[in-house]
Structure formats: C-alpha cells, structure tokens
Amino acid sequence: MRALPFEVLTGDGTRLRGESWPGGPDWVVMAHDFGGDLDCWRPLVGPLGAAGYSVAAIDLRGHGASEGEPATASIPVDLAALLAQARRDTSGLLVVVAAGTVAAAALSPDLLPRPDALVLFSPRLQEGVETNLRGDGTTKLFFVGAADPEADRTVVDLRNRSIGHAGVISFPTATQGADLLQEPWRSHVIEQVVGFVDHARAMSASPTREGGTG
C-alpha cells in the first residue's frame, strides 16, 4: 500500500500530521501513546489493507511531524479531530486503534463522533483523562502484557466495567502498548486485530444493526 499525507486540524487550530493508506469504504484510524509516533502501527497497515480497509495514523501534537506541545489535556481534542476527519471521509465502519493513555481516552463516551469499535493496547489511566464506560456500549478488544500486574489489573477492571462486548487478549510478558506488535507476539496480535475488525464490519452490516439505527 502506498502512503499518502494525512492532516487533521484540531478544534484549537493545531495541525496534526500523519499518513493514510486508502482502500475500501471502512476505516481504521490509529493513535500512538505519549513518547511514540505513528511508526509503531506499521505492522498493522499491510494486513488491514489486504483485508480491504482504509488505514490512517497520526502523530499526536508535539510528536513526529505534528505541531504543538504534548499535553494530557490535548488527547481528547486530538482524538475528536481524528474521528471527525475520518467520518468526513466515510460513512462506513470506523475503528479506533490506540495505546496507553490515548487508549484510555478513547473509552470516554463524550468523545464524538463515536467509533464503531475500539482496539486498545494497554490502556493507562491518568489524571485529567476521563474514562466512563457505563455510558458506552462500543465493542472493544484489549491487549495487555499480563506480567505487569498493574497493567493487567487495569485492563481486567475496564473489561468488567464495560457495557457490550469487551474481549481481552493477554500475553505472558511485561511488554505493553504498541510494543506488543513486535516479535514474538506480532503475528498473533495482527491476526486478532484483523479478525476483530472483520467481525465489527460484519456486525455493522447486519440487518439488525441497520434496522436499529433508524
């Protein structure tokens, strides 16, 4: 897949830069954790594209080629801008893939527009980032390195408090976040992500789903 420049203008005027790989009408958009950049998601790009999805990844403000300074308070603003841009580009399925503190922010029901599904790598709760699962039934898939007790407890708690489907895939390692896309876990993680997104696409196209939205 050939990468194209992808830009998002946030509500406070900050320009976020990234890359997109256009494909089918359904989109998977990806946001890294603090201290990273969009390169962490490259292992997913080819497999998702081969499955017929359009893919986009951004650098958060203050990271990579994006403008601004990194700040926890800016995470919801950046995520909302990314989702709004994706919704302008498609009326199809919209899936968010995120890691760490950004993954936790994606759980807020106040984040609009809402995605159809969430793939969350080691969500990390942090002061100033709201996570309120009781108001949101978005289907979710969590990844976590279970050898880190705090990370494992966080994911189990989030899964238990979730409304709607919430699956957890854990690995016997302290590795967390998008680093789980490295060996030896890479192929299994990729398979699970693509399978989950395929399932979300099938559910979004079902007559029950279509009838329930009218």
Where are the model-predicted features located?
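N-terminal cap/lid segment of alpha/beta-hydrolase-fold proteins
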Residues: 1-21
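Alpha/beta-hydrolase active-site loop
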Residues: 40, 70-89
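Short beta-strand/loop motif that positions the catalytic acidic residue
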Residues: 136, 142-144
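Primarily recognizes the serine-hydrolase "nucleophile elbow" in alpha/beta-hydrolase
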Residues: 84-137
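Conserved alpha/beta-hydrolase
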Residues: 48-67
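The serine-hydrolase catalytic nucleophile loop
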Residues: 34-46, 153-155
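Short beta-strand element of the alpha/beta-hydrolase
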Residues: 25-33
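Post-His helix in hydrolase/transferase enzymes
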Residues: 179-195
